[in-house]
Amino acid sequence: MKSKRNDAFQNKSIKVPFVVPNIDSSDKKAIAIALKSNLLTDGPILRKFEKEFSRFTGSKYAIGVSNATSALQLSLKSLGIGKGDEVIIPDITFVATANAVLFTGATPVLADVNEDDLNISINSIDKNITKKTKAIIPVHFAGKSCNMKSIQKFAKDNDLKIIEDCAHALGTKFDKKHVGTFGETGCFSFYPTKNLTTFEGGMIITQSKKMAENLRSLRNHGITKSLRQRFTKGHPWDFDIKQMGYNFRIDEIRSSLGLNQLKKIKKMNKLRQSACKYYNKNLKNIDGISVYEDPKLESNSCHLYVIKILSNFGITRNNLFSNFVKNGIRTSVHYKPLHKFSLYKNKCKIYFPLKTSKSLYPQILSLPLFPQITKNEMNSVIDVLKKQQK
């Protein structure tokens, strides 16, 4: 029998971790190659990573950044969104979505989510549009695409910008088109739990040359030239700054890792899809458990596997979480709704009741999911749920 995996949070083994980063020998080799370079940031490996990422997503331009939060923030700033403006975001999302809006001086407006996939509700978007609304940030939750056709129509009819939060969705498509290409920008995360990791990192994609040039400047203090341009043409100190920028760069080492991971992403996503199918098959007939089945799973990056604990299951979500811990299995919740955080109670606006997010929050639970997960590990998870019925 295979030995238990190490727990990332405690110095001991665990039966089933929540996630295991997919780092193999080829990734380590890619990192080693980057370390031999004399240029460890803003160099040729980043350019190649951006080029290949652009090709993979079908976008014209890709801009590597330090993380997805900075990707969102730069996108908002590049679109001129700031103080006095409102940006519609889903109530169930990671806090970074709200923080990026707040950093610009704009106000996040919390919209409700769909019962069937936890993506932002189209009806809720419609209700929350005001004279101050400047943009919508749809979050492709767990890897399932939002209804981008409807969101694009709302945006066009109301002269709004779209910034896609694709942190969960590398490989996700809507109508055969990669997410992130429907809005002004698409923002991706390379955090260790994501489908592609650079430890920390992110990427912005856009179809606009003007926006791409502006984003490259903004990520590097507002400087108008790249390092290569500065040191190969004229004097390296002779550059201009026309706007306030940030230090949101991504280095060559992480770019090399990301470039290598990108070569494997289709295979890794297929493994995730297979794991989701196995969970669905074994969980959908358990009384009190509701699974989120996606009929277009091949277009879903399957970043998370979320179940809903119904009232007839016998115990609460929190008690089930504790049962998993007792059995050496880590689970989590994605996410605590934004309206429940102290900061956002004061900083965000809620124009209409968030009925669905409020009702779903005590019910949802994310089960272990990663490309390397085995059937034995998934069976351990399934057994805990089945035993609760006895």
PLM features: residue spans?
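Conserved active-site segment immediately N-terminal to the catalytic lysine
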Residues: 164-198, 237-242
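Structural detector of well-ordered beta-strand residues that form the stable sheet scaffold
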Residues: 63, 88, 109, 162-163, ...
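N-terminal "arm"/small-domain region of PLP-dependent enzymes with the aminotransferase-like
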Residues: 1-39, 44, 240-242
